[in-house]
A protein has these predicted regions:
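Gly/Ser/Thr-rich loops at beta-strand to alpha-helix junctions
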Residues: 1, 58-59, 80-82, 138-143
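Catalytic or ion-translocation cores adjacent to nucleophile or general acid/base/metal-coordination motifs
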Residues: 2-45, 77-122, 156-167
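Short, solvent-exposed amphipathic alpha-helical segments in soluble enzyme
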Residues: 4-6, 66-71, 92-93, 150-153
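Short coil/turn connectors at secondary-structure junctions
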Residues: 6-9, 47-49, 70-72, 129-132
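A structural signal for short, well-ordered beta-strand segments and their strand-loop junctions
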Residues: 12, 53, 74-77, 133-139
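General structural feature for long, well-ordered alpha-helical segments within catalytic domains
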Residues: 16-19, 35-42, 57-64, 68-71, ...
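Active-site/ligand-binding-proximal alpha/beta "capping" segment
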Residues: 51-79, 84-86
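Glycine-rich, aromatic-lined ligand/substrate-binding cores of catalytic
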Residues: 120-216
C-alpha cells in the first residue's frame, strides 16, 4: 500500500495464499497471482500505483528476477527472519510440508531455512550491484546468515532506520502514532485534520494523510 500510494508498482512475494487474499480483501493489495510471468505482465500493463501479491517463496523468486535481468528500483524484506523456526518457510516446501518437517526434524528445518536465507540475501546483494536500492527492515535476515552461515557481506546493504529514519530524527522529524480509544473512525479524522492545520507547510505529509484517508 505504501508503494501504490506513492504511485509505484509493487511485487510482494508471500508463501501463504490466505495472507495475500486477506490483503486484497482489505484493500492493501490490488490482486493476487500464483505465476511470476502473469504478475510481471500485470505490473507492466498497470497505469499508476498497482500491487501484485505473488504466491511463492522469495528465495526462489528473487534469484529468478536477477537471472532474467529484472532490477527493481527498491528491494526490502519483511519476513519474520528473526525466528528461524516459525518465521521463515524454506524454499522447496509447501506450508504443509514445512509444518511436517518443523515437527519431525527441527534441526534440519532450521538448516533448510538458513540455506534459503543465504540464497535470498545473495540475490539481494546481486541486485544491489545492478542498481537496486536495498535495505533491511529490522527483521535480522542479515544477522542470521552472518552469524550462522559465515556471510558477513550480508551487511553490505543497510538497515532502514540508520539509512532513512535516523537522518529524519536529526531534523526533528520521526514516526508518530496515535489511537482513538473511542473506536470511532471519525476521531482519527479529527486528529488528522488537526495535524494538517498544525503543519500547513508540509506538502508531503498533507499528500500522505489525504491518500491514507482514502485507502485505509
Amino acid at each position: 500500500l505504501a508503494v501504490t500510494m506513492n504511485d509505484g508498482l509493487c511485487l510482494a512475494v508471500e508463501v501463504d495464499s490466505w495472507r495475500i487474499q486477506r490483503r486484497v480483501e482489505t484493500g492493501y493489495c490490488d490482486v493476487m497471482s500464483d505465476n511470476l510471468d502473469e504478475a510481471l505482465d500485470l505490473l507492466d500493463k498497470a497505469e499508476g500505483g498497482y500491487s501484485v501479491g505473488l504466491l511463492g517463496n522469495i528465495a526462489d523468486v528473487m534469484p529468478e528476477l536477477e537471472r532474467r535481468g529484472i532490477v527493481p528500483d527498491i528491494i526490502t524484506d519483511q519476513t519474520s527472519a528473526h525466528d528461524l523456526r516459525f518465521g521463515y518457510i524454506p524454499a522447496g516446501y509447501s506450508l504443509e510440508e514445512a509444518d511436517e518437517l518443523r515437527e519431525s526434524d527441527p534441526v534440519k528445518y532450521d538448516n533448510e531455512v538458513l540455506d534459503s536465507m543465504v540464497v535470498h540475501v545473495q540475490a539481494i546483494l546481486d541486485l544491489k550491484k545492478k542498481g537496486s536500492v536495498c535495505f533491511d527492515y529490522g527483521n535480522n535476515l542479515r544477522g542470521q546468515v552472518a552469524d550462522h552461515r559465515d556471510m558477513p557481506q550480508a551487511f553490505d546493504y543497510p538497515g532502514f532506520v540508520p539509512a532513512y529514519i535516523r537522518p529524519l530524527f536529526c531534523k526533528g522529524a520521526g514516526p508518530f502514532r496515535w489511537a482513538a480509544l473511542s473506536g470511532n473512525p471519525a476521531d482519527i479524522t479529527a486528529t488528522d485534520d488537526a495535524l494538517l492545520e498544525l503543519v500547513p507547510q508540509n506538502e508531503a505529509l498533507h499528500r500522505w494523510i489525504h491518500k491514507a484517508q482514502d485507502k485505509v
